[in-house]
Amino acid sequence: MRYLVISLFAVSLLMAGSALVGNAADAAKAPKKAIELKHGTSKRMHVMFNHTTHKDIACEQCHHDSPAPDKPYASCTDNDCHATPGPRERDTMSMFVAYHAKDTDRSCYGCHKKMAAQHPEFTGCRPCHMSQQARKEAAASEKK
């Protein structure tokens, strides 16, 4: 019994270690520059998304469909994943819902809502939707 417990513990450590290595490899593939998400009707509603800021979150949290094991994660609108048109469609396949679903931490809004207690700056729309910080990042990425 003792050897069984020790063996199971060793196997669980190996599995946890390999998961961490996988996340590190995924993080290395992530884009270094901020990405402007242009799915709103107004440029003021665009979002500057920086993968580096979100490096402690597993890629699968947002990119829940990987196109192929050897290919990096696809954009939300690739392969018609969240391509339903219309800014406020209640369809789970709409881009609006992918970003703004309230009751899940798989969406930007849901995750920020969950973390707002530790990070009060996560509340409201402006932290994402072309806030001063987002405008600075947009200007900096255009210069590069």
Curated annotation (Swiss-Prot):
This is Cytochrome c3. It comes from Nitratidesulfovibrio vulgaris (strain ATCC 29579 / DSM 644 / CCUG 34227 / NCIMB 8303 / VKM B-1760 / Hildenborough). Heme c 3 binds at residues 54, 108, 111-112. CDD domains: Cytochrom_C3. Heme c 4 binds at residues 100, 125, 128-129. Homodimer. Heterotrimer of cytochrome c3 FDH2C and formate dehydrogenase FDH2 alpha and beta subunits that forms the FdhABC(3) complex. Belongs to the cytochrome c family. Heme c 2 binds at residues 64, 76, 81-82.
